[in-house]
Design a protein with these regions (language model features):
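N-terminal glycine-rich FAD/FM-binding segment characteristic of electron-transfer flavoproteins
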Residues: 1-135
């Protein structure tokens, strides 16, 4: 069985957030984490793998190379492989299109996503991805 877990990289909620003079989010001194809902999805996938060793877990992130440490963390937690679509995640629609194209090119038996990311709290990516894949 092949499981795909889609993860987002979000600021740790304990980080002090600030903005630049141009009103842009200042990433300096911000710790980024795997979103807690995506972390939960990964934990459930690993639990399934512990019960059935033939399960293969893949991680997917739409983002830039700065997210690579979190993909490596996901591998350390128990994922077998990690993929990153190298693109700035502009909005939920853009991310959903990228995820759905990746899923169409690969054959997964189960797709797990968090209910929402804690940075924008939109909760749209999984719905949009499902609609694009006619699920």
């Amino acid at each position: 069985m092949k499981i795909l877990v889609c993860i987002s990289c979000v600021p740790d909620t304990t980080s002090k957030v600030s903005f630049t003079d141009e009103n842009k989010f200042n990433k300096d001194n911000i710790q980024f984490i795997i979103g807690p809902y995506e972390d939960y999805a990964l934990a459930r996938a690993v639990e399934l793998k512990e019960k059935k060793s033939e399960i293969d877990i893949s991680l997917l992130n739409v983002g830039l190379s700065e997210n690579d440490p979190l993909l490596r963390k996901g591998l350390a937690i128990g994922a077998d492989r990690a993929y990153r679509i190298n693109s700035e995640p502009i909005d939920s629609n853009f991310v959903a299109h990228n995820i759905s194209h990746f899923i169409e090119k690969n054959n997964f038996d189960l797709i797990l996503m968090g209910k929402e990311s804690i940075d924008y709290n939109s909760g749209l990516v999984h719905y949009l991805s499902g609609a694009l894949l006619d699920m």
